Amino acid sequence: MDQNKFVNYKDYKSYPIEEMQQRSIDFLGDIQRRRTIRDFSSKGVPEEIIINCLKSAGTAPSGANRQPWHFSVVSDSETKKKIREAAEKEEKKFYSGRAPDEWLEALAPLGTDENKPFLEEAPYLIVIFSEAYGLDEKGNKIKNYYVPESVGIATGILITALHNAGLATLTHTPSPLNFLREILGRGENERAFLILVTGFPSKTATVPDIQRKDLEDYTSFF
């Protein structure tokens, strides 16, 4: 192994065990307050906050360090309107016949339908694209690895960073998502992963009265 390609890891920060325990408790308490919001305020968000959160997302691990993601940040009202119109067109098809009954029954407790006003009301839409393959300076294809896993991890970090900054989020996945690549002018090598809606919750925002699984329901120790 070529040692010249490695540098000493100097950024690790150590904490006493007691402080580690408290930090884990504090983080748990904070992240447990995170909820998906569908009613957003039109109150503006400083762009620098969004930029810092995107930089956090960019630290995500990825297959072979390819970093196969692109974040299109939309705040322009006309572009948001185009995205809403295209999304609602697909969602109308979904709710009126494309989706199987079992899927619709699973969605019923969440109160969702084809109407997506949040796509215009929220100050920011972050459209996340995955790169099926990269391109070099000459336009030659570069193979990417573990693309869905890599983009999913980056998205999770972004959601956490936005929550930590005091913003609410909504993951929106109209199907199909092809219209996003056209509206936002992305390349043929990219696939829309999801729309992350973010901003402040409205003063009248509500959330479904649902419960998360208990630890023992999703964890095994060996």
Predicted stretch roles:
Residues 58-65:
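Glycine-rich phosphate/pyrophosphate-binding beta-alpha loops
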Residues 2-23, 113, 191-222:
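C-terminal helix-cap and adjacent tail motif
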Residues 65-69, 120-122, 191:
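Short, basic and Ser/Thr-rich N-terminal targeting/leader segments
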Residues 73-151:
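Glycine/small-residue-rich phosphate/adenosyl-binding loop
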Residues 180-193:
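Short, electropositive alpha-helical surface patch
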Residues 1-37, 41-51, 85:
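N-terminal accessory segments that position/regulate proteins before the catalytic core
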Residues 34, 55-58, 126, 132-183:
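Small-aliphatic-rich amphipathic alpha-helix that forms the alpha element of a beta-alpha
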Residues 56-58, 109-114, 180-182, 205:
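Glycine-rich, charged/polar anion/phosphate-binding loops
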